[in-house]
Amino acid sequence: MNEAVIDPILETAVNTGDMFCSQTIPNRCLKDTILIEVQPECADTLQCVLDDKVSRHQPLLLRNHKKLELPSEKSVTRGGFYMQQLELLVKSAPPNEYALLLIQCKDTALADEDNFFVANGVIDAGYRGVISALLYYRPGVTVILPGHLTIYLFPVKLRQSRLLPKNVLKHLDPIFKSIQVQPLSNSPSNYEKPVISEFADISTVQQGQPLHRDSAEYHIDVPLTYKHIINPKRQEDAGYDICVPYNLYLKRNEFIKIVLPIIRDWDLQHPSINAYIFGRSSKSRSGIIVCPTAWPAGEHCKFYVYNLTGDDIRIKTGDRLAQVLLIDHNTQIHLKHNVLSNIAFPYAIRGKCGIPGVQWYFTKTLDLIATPSERGTRGFGSTDKETNDVDFLLKH
């Protein structure tokens, strides 16, 4: 059973200035232990507790205990929504083999919960800054009542793959030239650029079946080879970055499906891994929403993208659009492990997810006792140089 622990000896040692002040806790002491530091001001706005609706292996639950008046001065427009970055006033330090998912949690069918949403987030083990959530809500929402905004910090145990990203296409030609692309049938009409890619059957050099038979077909060249589509990662990073292999054009409010020439075959002999695709925080904040989804074994890398920036945009070749997480199959998250999802803001049902058996360790001195981190407090795109990789083609 996972527990919330505050070690009085450790806290005293840190606060009285003996050896723990200049040393971190040995890694062996942090195995399957997630350090949490709750900022003092959190008590003014948020309740931070282990979820008592889960009998064992409890996720961390954050809930507003004061009403949240909207829109605030921090809100910005994102398509047909307002978006606001909410500081949750919590820091974390999981071991490198873990990550935290930030997910909206629902336990009752409250009517107003269909009017505001929390973008799914991935908290890397190396992130030491204050965790934030991205709140999207409809223009008519003026208040979120106490207890109606509930968020899980949900630990997942990661798996490593030596073959990703090196040999994921060992049975296919690694260079792709002719690729079929089509707009979705419900995309805005008269748009000059194709926005959805469906790849040819490379192994037989035959075109794949079009997704919509009434759609026009195009072909484009892909300048990147497969080894540049999925990037390597640092040990403290949760996911492998997924890059777009060509300039991607999205009209405002466009909802598209991306199919990349990567087949998940590296772990067909190792069914202990489930793969999931999530968006990147910098993209979600700008209004480019990658719908979180599973990546089933034996299938191409597919995911949906929703352009809520309010503008027509171009995402440049090589830009990091999404990330793939390899998660231990015993971890039951809010997404089905074998279904392609097109839901922009999926949420968890309270008490229905199964987290790994971790121990939560609450401390007031996380920066002193956590293992060193390369990323530190930099977040929301700090690992990217993305500011010039998205062109806004039409301003409103």
Curated annotation (Swiss-Prot):
UniProt feature coiled coil, ranges: none
Protein's name in the database: Deoxyuridine 5'-triphosphate nucleotidohydrolase
Source organism of the structure: Varicella-zoster virus (strain Oka vaccine)
Gene symbol of the encoding locus: DUT
Required cofactor names: Mg(2+)
GO BP, sorted A to Z: dUTP metabolic process
Residue numbers binding substrate: R280, S281, S282, F380, G381
GO function terms (MF aspect): dUTP diphosphatase activity; metal ion binding
Upper lineage: Viruses, Duplodnaviria, Heunggongvirae, Peploviricota, Herviviricetes
Function: Involved in nucleotide metabolism: produces dUMP, the immediate precursor of thymidine nucleotides and decreases the intracellular concentration of dUTP to avoid uracil incorporation into viral DNA.
